[in-house]
Amino acid sequence: MVLLAGPGPEGGGTRCLSPQSPTPPRSEQTGEDPADYEEYEDFSSLPDTRSIASDDSFYPPGGEEEYGSVSAESVPEGVPEAATLLRAACANDVGLLRALVRRGPSSEEVRETDRNGRTGLIVACYHGFVDTVVALAECPHVDVNWQDSEGNTALITAAQAGHVTITNYLLNYFPGLDLERRNIFGFTALMKAAMQGRTECVRALMMAGADVQARDPRRGLSPQEWAAYTGRAEAVRVIQRLMERPCPEQFGDKYKLELPLPAEAVLKKSGSKNCLQRFTAFLRSTLTSRSSGQSLEDGGVLDHMVRMTTSLYSPAVAVVCQTVCPENPPCVGKRRLAVQEILAARGNLNAQAQDSNKVECSEPQSQILETPRASSRSPKSPAASRSTPAPVTRKASLLPLQLLRRSSVRPGVVVPRVRISKAPAPTFQPERAASKGNTKDSIYLQIPKWRYKEAKEEKRKAEEAEKKRQAEAQKEKRAPRWRKRT
């Protein structure tokens, strides 16, 4: 039996023979050089035990501990190794890595690679070090599209390994990420994720705008065909489902939370049913088996529930987070920008709008008159004085006035006034304000009077006056005539 191990285009290099029974040397029988073969007493000592060919990788075995180009044996004992970004990333030392990033490393230090051509970002994506990837996102000079000796990028490595958190972080927080970068075999990140059956990574890459119709140069298969070729049925189903419904409409600002009417309700006649028809419909709905297939169809009740709970206007989502671009939801085949690119574009638009408003507001105030100095005063001709423009626009008119008027004595921002009054004595009792009267033109607030109450009051006064007049008339009639004569 022959075992293949080590580097090579076919996944094997050195030929190793299994232990044989005590027989004469093969060199005496065949005349071959005995140095061409190596005999092993134990299979655990074979180099193939450390092979990672099962992960579809062709890195030479036995090099995970050696992170740099300099081997550990070449470093003398007692001499501490220099702390580099590559060593910190390979050891998942986030504290040291952040300290090195704050120090401001050079481009050579950031692009340091191991013997396989992998940078610290690719190694972190390979092992699934999420905190290391987050720390490297803040490091300058990081090339997210760097390819190792096999042409694999950080995105290809993370998607192939199935690290969906790192894949989403690379897609969202690394500007300039190339989704269609291929390795030496012509495979993209979506193809590698489909081959390995990483359904979550396939979904993330497709919603980020990866090309679903891309084909490799050797076999000419698409990602869906590669998933079917390698027996990844779940990946095939996910790709087919996303191609049928490419855009999640609940993530847009035009989505409505209303449940659409079913086809039966739309086709149902508007005429009213009699008692017998309603009773028949009730019996039919009762005896009919309510299977889950009707609710799991597209546009059904469960589909609407999922859309409603995950939409931007859902109470569970609107309170927790706020999307950056609600007018541009993700879609299959449409390239999605990183968060930094979206915020930069929106910040530029807001800055331009604010600058235009500030310019319009500050133009009338930014015109000043230029007065000549005392040393340069000289008689000028009327033509020269007429040709010189009087108003001169300030060069710094684009700056806000509060920044231009800032000084060490009086800043541009208006300082509020604070008045402090002495506390009164404990026995102090405030005087009640005198009543200002019920005049209508008073500046103080008054109790409102309703119109119906005023009319009722006027009617009562009129009735009292009428009764009083009638009483006086009756009194005059009852008086004797001799009193009237006098």
UniProtKB/Swiss-Prot annotation:
Residues 451-479 have a biased composition (Basic and acidic residues). InterPro entries: Ankyrin_rpt (IPR002110), Ankyrin_rpt-contain_sf (IPR036770). The modification Phosphoserine is found at S397. Residues 372-394 have a biased composition (Low complexity). Residues 451-479 form a coiled coil. ANK repeats lie at residues 80-109, 116-146, 150-179, 185-214, 219-251. GO terms for molecular function: DNA binding. It comes from the Eukaryota. Residues 1-75, 354-394, 426-486 are annotated as: Disordered. Signal peptide: none annotated. Keywords: ANK repeat, Coiled coil, DNA-binding, Phosphoprotein, Repeat. The keyword Secreted does not apply. Residues 30-42 have a biased composition (Acidic residues). PANTHER family: ANKYRIN REPEAT CONTAINING, ANKYRIN REPEAT DOMAIN-CONTAINING PROTEIN 33B. This is Ankyrin repeat domain-containing protein 33B. The lineage of its organism: Eukaryota, Metazoa, Chordata, Craniata, Vertebrata. The gene is Ankrd33b.
